């Protein structure tokens, strides 16, 4: 598995696979072919069908600014290897000089055709939760300590930057009003949720309202193209920070404890990314929001100092009860149902932790098993339910 630096990516929304990934591919291509007088980018599959809503073309235009570049949306050519496929071509005096096919595999990660893995080195020797948990038990260490062992002590400075970026997104989100870009005329709601408490509000209502306000804040910032952290993707970036932000003052958790929780969450996200997928275009929203919920649950369980079995159960439950969740964004925008879904998943994460605290000893489903199940389920989903905006709510909304 790769470093958590490639899971927690600091960047701008609205989509890790449809903006951050293509931008990374374009920058890489330009480094390899800087002297062409004409470029062409051809988007296929989900990149073509929802690229306009995700502002893929706008993001690419920024990379190729000052150069002659044509962007083509090819919605007909099938994409067998990965639904997020793109070709970039370089021409000189009308002749093709270089052509590379890239796949945006989720979370801002891209690989070129023929590459078995990304260019990033694998630093984790173990690839399953079962192996990692056995290792940690033998050494009598917690999951975050295994992360530190593999990543080195310098990873804490990066995680500090991750946490600061998450908090900044929350702060901007709960202070900003207005309509989100894209044509849906969707009103920002985070500020309202944060400020509009009920008279004689119960503790339970306050808990849910604040968690949702924080999740909305980050997700709305993402939809507006603001700076966020993929956790594990842009579309699911609100869940982990919402849970951490809510819990920190509840028990006066220190920054060090929050960073350890984020390290624990990264292990969950990395295992899913390595053994399955975090891409909505590949496996539906279960791969994005399900993973985010599992990461948040694991992080919260670490804050509460639950044992490894309880952490595993909280993460497993979070995926299990998102199985089959479709990715059908209306008009290809990371707005409906994405923003609201982040809030629901944040609340679910805490529910999973509470249940795991009591029932971990009697569980029957393991984390590795549910990850495999999620991947199989995602592959079985019809393509119209995998970030193409051709089915589900996206279709019904268009027909209405």
Where are the model-predicted features located?
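Conserved phosphate/anionic-ligand binding catalytic regions in large, soluble enzymes, centered on
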Residues: 8-26, 224-243, 285-293
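C-terminal regulatory domains involved in ligand/effector binding and gene-expression control
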Residues: 63, 69-201
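Short beta-alpha connecting loops at secondary-structure transitions
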Residues: 9-11, 279-284, 329-338
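Functionally critical mobile loop/hinge segments
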Residues: 300-400
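Non-transmembrane, aqueous-exposed alpha-helical and coiled segments at domain scale
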Residues: 4-9, 23-47, 53-54, 82-84, ...
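Alpha-helical support elements that line or immediately flank enzyme active sites
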Residues: 19-32, 241-252, 297-305
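Contiguous, well-ordered alpha-helical segments that form the cores/surfaces of helical PPI scaffolds
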Residues: 213, 217, 238-248, 263-271, ...
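Accessory "access/gating" subregions that flank catalytic or transport cores
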Residues: 167-252, 256-271, 277-284, 392-400
